[in-house]
């Protein structure tokens, strides 16, 4: 293999294996009105072009259903196709309407085929259902939850639904708070998942020392606890953030300066290294929730409310704390999906848990979801406008999390027989987790073998 070919292959591997970074997107605005395709497309375009960043090109969805419909596929899908935004699909699993989620998934596969498949990072069955079903969730009036056996049943339904389709290789997981993951009664869900989604918000850990100076340690601790029970499965950061405005939670003050600090200390080490979906791009349109986590204000703009640039020191910290293992990279590559990230990533939980499944009148409406949220922190309370909540992902938050150093760089470079230079390149690039540094090292190893 020629030198130029080696370099090209190494860079291609590095690019394809970089972790996904994006935001959470609900199917409604902060007033409960349904988002349209143009709304999603504007958000995805903004996220890709945020000043000070390399672009946030992935979207985590809470539901497959378009707001205001029974089971029409969410218009975020054609918007993502148009903007080339990768997708962590979500099916809402609380409230007894799962058949409509499955129907929307089937229709989306039929309608979008390869265009959808090439964008799918994975599929999440549920979001914080186990937390809402817990003693703490009930006490916090977090909304309808689901028991672990039902989540496992839903996961199996999704596997059956996608079998033999364009999405047959998509990894399936569940998103919940770290407190739910470490609860042994939920272990069957871990067994059923290909990956675990971690939601964590130190801001809401108000029974602990949770000032901004404590936030990274709290996040890291909760991620580590989640990874400890994950049985070797990847943990993805599916929700975390710090509010730009809102009430003070014990020692946690919601303001722009602290949101920036949290971004620097927690976000920057994750971005590009661990699959991460931040909470949230915008939650103040048209109504500003309390607390508000949006990094842009009420007007959608590529100019954020605070500086999003990450320093070199943050990047260096990332390479030492969130490098996926070679096995997780290989597994991701084998799926043939939008596995731009084979991250064994840190994961935790306790996001703004959408107390979904209820309409404004308090009964399940089976369509668009109302939009308040409560959360998974210790002794959480309903914190946004209504007591119902939703797959909208647009307000409130809670819980705790931890950034955990996950994964290890396990490059495989030797064997009993002399491998070819191309094999060395491929193995080294996989083992070094797709970073540019890994690609450079891979090239050096390959050249040394020539």
UniProtKB/Swiss-Prot annotation:
GO terms for cellular component: cell surface; extracellular region; fungal-type cell wall; plasma membrane; side of membrane. The active site is at 128 (proton donor), 239 (nucleophile). Residues 380-420 are annotated as: Disordered. Pfam families: Glyco_hydro_17. The GPI-anchor is attached to the protein in the endoplasmic reticulum and serves to target the protein to the cell surface. There, the glucosamine-inositol phospholipid moiety is cleaved off and the GPI-modified mannoprotein is covalently attached via its lipidless GPI glycan remnant to the 1,6-beta-glucan of the outer cell wall layer. Belongs to the glycosyl hydrolase 17 family. It is an enzyme of class 3 (hydrolase). Keywords: Carbohydrate metabolism, Cell membrane, Cell wall, Cell wall biogenesis/degradation, Glycoprotein, GPI-anchor, Hydrolase, Lipoprotein, Membrane, Polysaccharide degradation, Secreted, Signal. A lipid is attached at residue 427 (GPI-anchor amidated asparagine). It catalyses: Hydrolysis of (1->3)-beta-D-glucosidic linkages in (1->3)-beta-D-glucans. PANTHER family: GLUCAN 1,3-BETA-GLUCOSIDASE (PTHR16631), GLUCAN ENDO-1,3-BETA-GLUCOSIDASE EGLC-RELATED (PTHR16631:SF13). One of its GO terms (molecular function) is glucan endo-1,3-beta-D-glucosidase activity. It is a lipid-anchor; GPI-anchor. Coiled coil: none annotated. GO terms for biological process: cell wall organization; polysaccharide catabolic process. Glucanases play a role in cell expansion during growth, in cell-cell fusion during mating, and in spore release during sporulation. This enzyme may be involved in beta-glucan degradation and also function biosynthetically as a transglycosylase. The gene is eglC. This is Probable glucan endo-1,3-beta-glucosidase eglC. Residues 1-18 form the signal peptide. It is found in: Cell membrane; Secreted, Cell wall. Glycans are attached at residues 183, 365, 371. Its EC number is 3.2.1.39. It comes from Neosartorya fischeri (strain ATCC 1020 / DSM 3700 / CBS 544.65 / FGSC A1164 / JCM 1740 / NRRL 181 / WB 181) (Aspergillus fischerianus). Residues 380-395, 405-420 have a biased composition (Low complexity).
